[in-house]
């Protein structure tokens, strides 16, 4: 068979286009704001300061990721201009930052903006502007509703489903459960809470005490005292790392030893477990979907070896024990793949189209057996987790991979 050279093929296609009067789609370059022949602008907000500042490492690691991509030639020949702003975990500040990113910096999309309350504040704005709001750093179930909000997509397993899994596990494994709940008083906390109640079903009356805190509170000591005094023998901890560490440390000070279920967003050894005191967190249960860098079983895994080498080269000084650095690397890899799939069609519409077109994609640092799948009607990229129990200085996975369609 005669081998067709690229030059011959393109010339032939051009001739065909002249005959038919149609343009050659694959030869066209299409750009919206934030994209050009040389650059792709991506916007980001992160709490580099404030009560959730432990998540600041996510933004720093994402910056390092794009630096490494640019050093390797960029994405399809275009350098990434990553603009990351500090919103302090303050929704009103997030609005200010995102307006700047969209209206002044004119980014192609925002990526991994962090926090349920912060993303809630910009949700309607981004969809009204029809600017992609991709792979947000929050598991609220509202990020997976393409009919109502076609320009917003989540990333991690949604909080509602995660909470259902905790509830079902405790009902099956804790005898005579009396449950105390600590919850951040916003949409993030409420999403977990609603899922937890759904999972408990007819056993919802096992919740004997439910207390809340505000992200601006200095401590949650008084709330933990109330939970202990309720007689609860199970503690469902719906809090960000600062308060997760405080609450588990306070429980130990009070000699309160419930079975603790800790939301995934506060499972980092570096930012939550060590600050709480390792002796105070033995046996804590969480759900995971990413490889934990402190788990020795992954030491010989190719993904882990690649990540460690990358961290040492591009993110030197950052903790190899902080799961947030794994999260940032994994979600950046998904954004990277999305942009690669866009080719030269870097429009808002095509970015969303490609983000919604993954089928069982194997993402680096995700647990074996868990993949990324999306479609125009499914905006939940990852919908599976595995339970894990803290032992010694690390998490130990147990049981099977559990998947559930979000409700």
Model-derived features: where do they sit?
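N-terminal export signals
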Residues: 8-27
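Immediate post-signal peptide segment of exported/extracytoplasmic ligand-binding proteins
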Residues: 27-42, 75-79, 171-176
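Beta-alpha junction/loop-to-helix N-cap segments that form part of ligand/metal-binding clefts
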Residues: 29-30, 54-60, 72-145, 155, ...
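Venus flytrap/periplasmic-binding-protein-like
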Residues: 87, 134, 141-144, 215-216, ...
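Extracellular/periplasmic Venus flytrap/periplasmic-binding protein
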Residues: 93-96, 103, 141-144, 150-255, ...
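Segments of small-molecule ligand-sensing domains
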Residues: 313, 317-325, 336-395
């Amino acid at each position: 068979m005669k081998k067709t050279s690229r030059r011959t093929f393109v010339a032939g296609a051009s001739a065909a286009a002249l005959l038919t009067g149609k343009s050659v789609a694959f030869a066209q370059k299409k750009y919206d704001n934030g994209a050009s022949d040389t650059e792709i602008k991506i916007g980001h907000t992160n709490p580099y300061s404030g009560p959730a500042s432990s998540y600041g490492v996510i933004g720093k690691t994402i910056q390092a990721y794009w630096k490494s991509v640019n050093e390797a030639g960029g994405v399809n020949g275009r350098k990434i201009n990553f603009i990351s702003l500090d919103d302090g975990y303050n929704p009103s500040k997030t609005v200010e930052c995102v307006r700047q990113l969209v209206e002044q910096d004119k980014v192609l999309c925002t990526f991994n903006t962090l926090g349920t309350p912060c993303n809630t504040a910009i949700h309607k704005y981004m969809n009204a502007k029809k600017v992609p709001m991709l792979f947000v750093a929050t598991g609220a179930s509202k990020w997976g509703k393409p009919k109502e909000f076609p320009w917003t997509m989540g990333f991690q397993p949604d909080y509602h489903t995660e909470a259902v899994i905790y509830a079902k596990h405790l009902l099956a494994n804790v005898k005579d459960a009396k449950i105390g709940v600590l919850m951040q008083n916003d949409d993030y906390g409420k999403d977990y809470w609603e899922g937890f109640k759904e999972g408990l079903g007819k056993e919802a009356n096992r919740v004997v005490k439910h207390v809340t805190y505000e992200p601006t509170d200095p401590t949650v000591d008084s709330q933990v005292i109330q939970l202990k005094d309720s007689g609860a023998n199970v503690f469902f901890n719906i809090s960000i790392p600062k308060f997760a560490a405080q609450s588990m440390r306070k429980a130990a000070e009070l000699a309160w030893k419930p079975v603790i279920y800790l939301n995934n967003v506060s499972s980092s050894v570096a930012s939550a477990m060590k600050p709480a005191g390792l002796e105070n967190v033995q046996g804590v249960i969480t759900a995971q979907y990413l490889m934990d860098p402190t788990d020795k079983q992954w030491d010989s895994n190719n993904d882990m070896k690649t990540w460690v080498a990358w961290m040492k080269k591009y993110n030197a000084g950052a903790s190899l024990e902080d799961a947030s650095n794994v999260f940032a690397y994994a979600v950046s890899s998904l954004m990277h793949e999305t942009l690669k799939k866009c080719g030269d069609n870097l429009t808002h519409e095509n970015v969303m189209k490609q983000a919604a077109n993954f089928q069982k994609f194997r993402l680096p640092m995700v647990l074996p057996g868990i993949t990324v799948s999306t479609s125009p009607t499914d905006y939940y990229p990852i919908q599976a987790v595995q339970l894990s129990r803290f032992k010694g200085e690390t998490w130990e996975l147990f049981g099977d991979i559990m998947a559930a369609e979000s409700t």
